[in-house]
């Protein structure tokens, strides 16, 4: 998982835009830039500082893992 923090206080908002995504490909280009392809991603606007942001991310990851486990348990055939 790749996390990018974009402070919005420069725009007068005072919040942080957190972008998270999975990186598929990273390669240099002819113009000395880097091309990054993302398989999926999303944005969250948060007011908390970085420590609280990572706490929110961890909670979201734990919730996703729990939901996946429940889904797998429901797909197991009963004898």
Short names for language-model regions:
Residues 1-17, 21-79:
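Eukaryotic intrinsically disordered, low-complexity regulatory linkers and tails enriched in Ser/Thr/Pro
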